[in-house]
């Protein structure tokens, strides 16, 4: 007995595809995008918000992929870790946080070293430098004399050469608080790799655990940064460098203060995973290792801010109704359509299939702007042919990953690649009667340089498009051809919209609302639409 072919709802997330009217330095507006341009004109479309309070971040804070996918899958505005930690600092509860209090007491009593590892940045995407300052004050309160800072430089979620200002600010606070020393520097390209490029992680790890690395006399963090700039190396790519003695040794305590897991996981594995095989190393133990948030439930670390429980997320509702779903992305965004979209759940839900397409092995993605978009599209078309999935979630990484390089021409090529792939995907969605939803998790490629003409490599606070291409096999009930979309939407509204199209009930935990406006007519028993006068 054959099952009835399914007409799916296909959610396509164009990572980093934002909107702004100004076309100057705008890779999306400059690129030739006939597919998405025609869809925007021909089908119901609107803009939605992906930053600030709309996604659980502080007002004015740019969104990011983790936050975006979390809100997309949860169907509610999820208070983000940046806000939770800032609140703990403000109300004083950081000082009594059990995991932080425990490691500080152990270090203080044993007279060992406390190491603070993390991204020194005001970007607020993976970490925030204010959190580091709060930890220095906490160490001071515990009378810890040896506090070693392993500073990771940003230049991706912040301007490419902003590290000097950040380090100067940190040094002033160190002098004011009276504790702490910067002992190593590393660009995030090395210390925060997430694509299993273990040679990068090893360089950062070796510098942190090895006191034998030669250090020039009177060598300061600013000297190292200046030297990098002189060699045309920006913050993100600064090679791991030892500045002063202070290696991570047995008996020490470590606090990794990045709050976003995906780019902190690999370095943490190198320190704490007894089965680690990314590169040869002698594990430092015993080591009391604390992570700000849960990077991986299998890692043996204490966690300062434990995961929030998100019940009745989109994937669970689909699974609970016995429907199959698919998550598809290349390596760089695979965790986002799986772990983050599922509210921090690692394992697949019942009936959830996953396809991982390897990202190209290049040092920076301006070297290969198409990335693996063609293979992602090929896998999506093959999955559509099966006619078994009620929901498909697909991420195209190009506009974000290439946009982060600050290279305009390469980003234009990335945008055009994705547009071409959308055309192929659209044809197959139409063939199977599915409904296609196109949106983004945050902006990026619409701003490639700043007001002074320098490369802009960070995300933006701009809105993103949302397009609804209604399919014959997945018609929206009671709307006919008169589907209208709200103009005040946010990412949390997309899950309720999908449930609306699938005709599944929205749980009370979902505080988002469907983007589909109430129909201007109703369908009577004779199936003829009757206009409602308002």
Swiss-Prot record:
Reactions performed catalytically: (2R)-2-phosphoglycerate = (2R)-3-phosphoglycerate
Positions annotated to bind Mn(2+) 1: 400, 404, 459
PANTHER family per the UniProt record, alphabetical: 2,3-BISPHOSPHOGLYCERATE-INDEPENDENT PHOSPHOGLYCERATE MUTASE
The protein, known as: 2,3-bisphosphoglycerate-independent phosphoglycerate mutase
EC number assigned by the record: 5.4.2.12
Keywords per UniProt: Glycolysis, Isomerase, Manganese, Metal-binding
Residues at the catalytic site: 65 (phosphoserine intermediate)
Superkingdom as given in the UniProt entry: Bacteria
Family: Belongs to the BPG-independent phosphoglycerate mutase family.
Pathway where this protein functions: Carbohydrate degradation; glycolysis; pyruvate from D-glyceraldehyde 3-phosphate: step 3/5
Its job: Catalyzes the interconversion of 2-phosphoglycerate and 3-phosphoglycerate.
Record note on cofactor: Binds 2 manganese ions per subunit.
GO molecular function terms attached to this record: manganese ion binding; phosphoglycerate mutase activity
Cofactor: Mn(2+)
GO-annotated biological processes: glucose catabolic process; glycolytic process
Annotated binding of Mn(2+) 2, by residue: 15, 65, 441-442
Any one GO cellular component localisation term in the record: cytosol
Taxonomic source organism: Acaryochloris marina (strain MBIC 11017)
Residue positions binding substrate: 126, 156-157, 188, 194, 260-263, 333
Pfam families xref list: iPGM_N, Metalloenzyme
Gene that this sequence comes from: gpmI
Assembly mode: Monomer.
